[in-house]
Every structure is written in structure tokens, then in C-alpha cells.
Amino acid sequence: VADWTSGVPAFYRHATGRNRFDFQLQKTAPGEDYHIIAVSDPQTHTDAHFAKFAGEPVADMAKTAGEFDGAAVGLVLGDISWDRIEILDMYRKEIVRVGIPFYPVVGNHDNQASLQGDSAASAAYRSKMGPENYAFCIGKDVVIVLDNIIYGTNFKCTIGYTDEVIRWVENLLPLLPTDACLYVAQHSPLNHEGNGLVNEDALLALLRGRNVNFLSGH
């Protein structure tokens, strides 16, 4: 597993101006068994809110993780903050206390509402937490993290997958074992308020025939 002592697993590198990429890896427990802790929507806005999250919830997760045998990872399924981007720095500092790598998912409240457009609104998130779309292996299985928040501006967003995300999944799947269990980790559930998501049918068509579990919050 990539080094995660910064609060976010360092499995990625910024490519601009570089032609060599070195990664510090840590050996995981042997065997194919694993555990996943999935949490969502801490939605902390004030320092007092965050102190509550960093108290009993983090302590409980650390206790649970300490009882695991074998590999273990955590997923935080979006809305780490409530429209306060500096909370992400506080989160990174505290989540390492759980004792396992925690992988983030972007939520609608992790965007900057004052900016216009999906990429601009999530730029600060990317700088602190890494890419919005990525995948990693655990045991023989694979976790696929997707951004299904298409942000506009001023708290307005569309739920679904951009064409770019769909193309990324399409290119990823041939690289994955067909017998692997896939966990799709995303912020909004598939059936959002009784409505389908933008490009939902395209995603499900790509995943057809696979063993898939969706993990979400919102």
C-alpha cells in the first residue's frame, strides 16, 4: 500500500514537468482476506463540529481497526466538510489515528461554491486530497472511486457521471480481473431521490456481468 501517513494514501503524483515517479510502498498483511471501514458525510463546518468527529468517532474506528486481522482500509464517502475547504487539512491530520489507510471520495460539500464549473470548484479538493477518480486493489478485489457530483456553482450540482468519467471506467475495466469483486465508492447513491443519474445507464452497461457492490453516502 502507498504511504498514508499524510492522511491520504500517496498513490498518485502530479505529472507536469516530471518524467520519473517514485512511490514509497508498505507491505500489507499476507493473504486474501480484508476489511473495509466505510463512513460518510461527517459534514463538519465549524471547529467544534470537527472536534466531535475527531473525538469518539475516530476513537471508535481506531478500536475497530485494531481488532482486524489481515489487510484493512477505510473509505470516507464524501462531504468530509460542509463547504469549508480548510476542514480537509484538519481531517488529514486526525484520520491517521485510525491506524489504516483511508481513501477519500469527493462530495458536493467538498467543492468550493464560489467557483464556476466542475473542475474549478473541485480544484482545491484535488490539491489536498488527490484525484477524484481512481482505483486500488485489496486482496483479489478492486475498489473504484468515482466522482458523481457534476458541480455548477453556488451550491448547485447535477448528480451523475461526466462523459470523461465514463471513458475512464471504460478504459479501466479491461485491466481488472473478470472474477474480482468490484466496490464502486461514490458520494451519491444510484437512485438519488427516486431519479436516475446522468450517464447512469452507461455506467451500468459497462459493469454488466461483473460482481459489483456500490458504496455511497449523501
Give the residues covered by each predicted segment.
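Extended active-site neighborhood of metal-dependent phosphoesterases/phosphodiesterases
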Residues: F11, I85-E170, L176, N199-N211
